[in-house]
Amino acid sequence: MPFAAAVFADLARIRQNAPLVVNITNNVVTNATANALLALGASPAMTHHPADAAELAALAGALVCNMGTPGGENIEAMLAAGGAANAGGVPVVFDPVAAGVTSRRREVAGRMLETVRLAAVRGNASEILALAGEAALSKGADSQHASREAAPAAVALARSLGCTVCVSGEVDVVTDGERVVELAGGHAMMTRVTGLGCTATAFVGAFLAVNPDYFAATCHAMAVMAAAGRLAAAGVAGPGSLAVRFLDVVYSLTEAEIAAGARVSA
């Protein structure tokens, strides 16, 4: 099946089935992430309480854990929900926001990797390098490395964790430790809208909920981000307009638009 057709088939399943995607995310992006998942066709649930998160995770199609604001309850919720998801066979996606920047974030990322069996990890190059134990430069949550620089670390991390790893950037790199795919598309203006990386992680969760091939599902989610970002940026005055238009584009995205807006290479 052509790549765009495979992406759209998964997107159609999301739109038809509205999988429950449980998010334990940061307090900067909660509303934006929920709206993006709704535009995609998924059903978002946003939670921070450990007991609540664990119960929801057991019912979910996927669990998304984002450590952007690593407060105590958030982290305990991620660990509790991760355990419940693992017990129920629910895929878990981890977004290690600014993983190597502070000792607190290094500690939280380490606990997640040690405690929860992950289906996928999505981060920028600095975050993936930090998770892999390599030196990385970052400015807060922003990477100071190109995504391709982190490709070898992503492969090693995918092998050690037994999961799919996505390094997002101007070119997205997705690997399961054996296969490596690059996805180009999107628009530079996307870096001026806070939370679109978190949206990408949430989209990975939605695609994992409908496709048991987690490598393919991650590629498909990033293709939707690339195609929608490119279309949303066309003709807008700036990032404020892009943020609004992105939801509209995702809501009505077609197979032809995916084919035109996301370029894949192995």
From Swiss-Prot:
Protein's name according to its UniProt entry: Hydroxyethylthiazole kinase
Catalytic reaction equation(s): 5-(2-hydroxyethyl)-4-methylthiazole + ATP = 4-methyl-5-(2-phosphooxyethyl)-thiazole + ADP + H(+)
Gene3D superfamilies per record: 3.40.1190.20
Stored NCBIfam families: PRK09355.1
Pfam families registered for this protein in UniProt: HK (PF02110)
Domain of life where this protein originates: Bacteria
Cofactor(s) the record lists: Mg(2+)
EC identifiers of the protein: 2.7.1.50
Keywords assigned by UniProt, alphabetized: ATP-binding, Kinase, Magnesium, Metal-binding, Nucleotide-binding, Thiamine biosynthesis, Transferase
Enzyme class: transferase
Cystine residue pairs: none
Protein function: Catalyzes the phosphorylation of the hydroxyl group of 4-methyl-5-beta-hydroxyethylthiazole (THZ).
InterPro entries assigned to the protein according to its UniProt record, in alphabetical order: Hyethyz_kinase, Ribokinase-like
